[in-house]
């Protein structure tokens, strides 16, 4: 899609150059080896409905600036909300003071991997309709209409609906001379239907599979997702789910839809290949990683069919950017190739620690008040160029389960032992779907699971999934991230009955 949008004038009208000159000049005067400044404005809105009636509309805006320095080999950071040159000078001085105090306990001298200088460059994400330019009433009307379609169906007792959209505007400048201006928009619509068995008091739910996307309001009104088909199908699928038999625990061949597999990629590959986890720098929030650096180039992560890439360039990706929060341009690289671990996600400091020639652009802060940390790229399983369709993959399974949609999961602090559930499950008998199942969870270790992958679907099965709210760091930060993948088959995976397990 040709890029026709630009960064909003209201953001460009902020005193970006004056703040830059004040902060960076003062940092250099104080002897910093490196300094950078970020000015950010982040707008969020969430519209929530219950049973097709408005429940809440929440709006938020976060505007501020942050100064980060390297002084005598130590990080310093300070942030504020007053956009004046005097405040920028004060923040530079405060960041240097933080670095001076921290130097006494810093055992690893901070050095940044080199990056070309990008002078006065601009990037805007691919979207057509800015949701923040539409009246709330117009957005609520469409969400109400979609909700009413579900609520009118037999057996649907309640419908919970929401749509969250975000506009992120970011200016970055550093002492090397880079100056970047960026704007990106993302959206996450969600519709959940619920049915209640009044005789037993039990209930079941099912929600739309549409993933969050780096798109605008056109995601709900255009052709990139078939909302009409999905909303029409959910009530009948939900009725089938309520009558489905409980799964018999055992080992099955699994055919996993992209709507479920993206989350397994996120937890068992995405987080496991963040270099700060692999080095032990990140541990408190969800652990370190079994994929340690001594295994790079030798760890058999999965079958030879496993090809996983990281990127910050995929169109409509949630982690897609022009430049990261250290001024590094978006790139694509291999993480797992032919089943072997070959790469990590890194920022400039981690790249230098490992002797890499360059960062692959994985620094991100979720607000102007937070320091950038190493965050996840779009981490994706590549399809087989001439690979089979989903129906063809199912057709090759004698006894198995087809897994659709994400739900709950758990994974250990090394990103190794895990289990995942889903939205719906279908029994496969002699290559055909034979009705839904309930109470299914699949369980494995990361390398056993990916090692059991025997078929990878073609490009026609590929879907870009993802999440708005990947958590990391302390104080906690959230980041949006996409994971593309095709349908894939996994042989003889352990399946648990969740009801039986809960009663143990």
Regions found by a protein language model. Name each.
Residues 1-504:
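N-terminal small-residue-enriched
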